[in-house]
Amino acid sequence: MPELEQIRCEREQILMDADSSLDHVFFPDSGVVSAVAVYADGSIIEMATIGREGCTAVQAVFGAKISSVRLLVQIPGGAAKMSRAAFMRAIGSMPSFRTLIYAYLQALLEQILVSVACNGAHNLKQRLARWLLMMRDRSDDDTLQITQSLLGEMLGV
């Protein structure tokens, strides 16, 4: 797609903040991005994990123009960046792209539902194991370079 710009994402970089204009969609091709909720006291907790299987800011499909989450780079890597307008044009004019995005939306919803169930039913050690596996699946690297502080925030501890 000609409207994609390749960018480098650095660890703990904020690609988009909550309550900011939803101007771009990011397609990680390496590395991992988390969609996190930001609370009034500044604390955060992870709601979704995005790697090469998907894209950020899919709420644009439903007409959203303001981001409801912070997009935080967990594992550095590359990504393709596309404007929200170009993303919406592609969804409208490319049936195969639209089908892929809808399939990803379904997978993302499943991921969020499993995460909610896991957070309610499992202890911290089990949640950590799930989180590490999700990071490994999306990064193709056995070494995860992440701080204990950020890991604690992602797990809500």
Where does each model-flagged region fall?
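Short loop/turn microsegments at loop-to-beta-strand junctions
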Residues: 4, 22-23, 142
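Cyclic nucleotide-binding regulatory domains
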Residues: 13-76
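Cyclic-nucleotide recognition modules
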Residues: 48-106, 110, 114
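Polybasic "coupling" helices that flank or enter modular domains
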Residues: 75-76, 91-157
